[in-house]
Amino acid sequence: MRRFARVALLFLGCGVCSLLYGVSQLALSLEQEAGGARQRQARESAAPGGGRQAGSADGGEEGAGRCKNLSVSFWNSYWMLPSDVCGVNCFWEAAFRYTYMETQPSETMHLAVVACGERLEETITMLRSAIIFSIKPLHFHIFAEDQLHESFKDILDDFPYEGKVNYTLYPITFPSEGAKEWKKLFKPCASQRLFLPLILKDVDSLLYVDTDILFLRPVDDIWSFLRKFDSTQIAAMAPEHEEPRIGWYNRFARHPYYGVTGINSGVMLMNMTRIRRKYFKNDMTSVRLRWAEILMPLLKKYKLNITWGDQDLLNIMFFHNPESLYVFPCQWNYRPDHCIYGSNCKEAEEEGIFILHGNRGVYHDDKQPTFRAVYEAIKNYSFGDDLVRSLLQPLELELQKTVHTYCGRVYEVFIKQLKKSIKDLSVRRSKGS
């Protein structure tokens, strides 16, 4: 019995000693923190501006960079972060917890397009449609073959919106590994879009569109979806089909795809900062891979099974990472498939088409005259002319000639939003904004 009592006393003594040691260390850390705070305050009061932002800890650039770096190698065990890492209380907190880690859409809207071959006129028409109704400044990132650069420059320099619109021309470039395969994937240069997060390293958010896109409402409105992303979402696209019975992926695909009918990448809104940071789940390795690491392995594994090139690769990625995709309604990427088999985009029927996507070359043949009429109307519109007399009224007359087609039977959806956009623009101009 005495032996047990001695053991109990020994444990009790050890416990008391541990408690005293913990209290002394806590008191010491509080004293050091108070002293450090006084020293920092003295330094900051002597510096211009006097204050500092969260994340600019005393560790200088190294400390600030360490605080913002998402690699787990920067954080010690149990997420107990050293006091010199962050300019906030990081105790028991993870790197993702603080708002300064979140990126906010910038005031300027960034729009990217890739143009190869005979796509100059189509691209210019798309850019014109983006300019007509948009409110915030636009910066166009145009990736084009070298022989197209001079033509783009001559046309864009004549646009009458100096100050509101800027542009940058880029050559078509692919990674040295597999450059030939990337260039010929699906259509010439189409896969360039996959490398935009790696090329435009200083651009936080970006709207990528195909050349055959027409904006029927301000770019600002689709840009605002960035603020609707939850903490896991990195991109937004529309479904490939609304009706599974006419879907391509669910009937013919030989690879994984997102959701029920897949996604269409002709209109792709991206938070590129998040894309560059994310580690993607995949079916090639148990290790998650970053964007730059996953593209080539995906192509090597699936190149014999994909039909639509880079769009198929994006479907595979988001099949494994569905939580990272925001899906917007079909009216933001309205294609011939939404009307040639009968109207199957309810949102467009109710509110009109927001973004028209004339894939399959429908702007340049007579197979879908409804789509071609919208394209020709915007192409022929002169900046500064009255939008009702020079754009809307001629377009409505042309659309009425297409009622013999399935899409022409619902031609009202092609001008419903356009009418509203013109009215809203007129109100803004009357208010001087």
From Swiss-Prot:
Membrane-protein topology: Single-pass type II membrane protein
GO biological process, alphabetically ordered: O-glycan processing
Protein name, as recorded: Glucoside xylosyltransferase 1
Enzyme class: transferase
A GO molecular-function descriptor: UDP-D-xylose:beta-D-glucoside alpha-1,3-D-xylosyltransferase activity
SUPFAM superfamilies: Nucleotide-diphospho-sugar transferases (SSF53448)
EC number: 2.4.2.42
Origin: domain of life: Eukaryota
Positions on the Cytoplasmic side per record topology: 1-6
One cellular-component annotation, GO: membrane
Reaction it catalyzes: 3-O-(beta-D-glucosyl)-L-seryl-[EGF-like domain protein] + UDP-alpha-D-xylose = 3-O-[alpha-D-xylosyl-(1->3)-beta-D-glucosyl]-L-seryl-[EGF-like domain protein] + UDP + H(+)
Native source species: Gallus gallus
Protein encoded by which gene: GXYLT1
Transmembrane region(s): 7-29
Subcellular localization, as worded in the UniProt entry: Membrane
Major subcellular location class: membrane
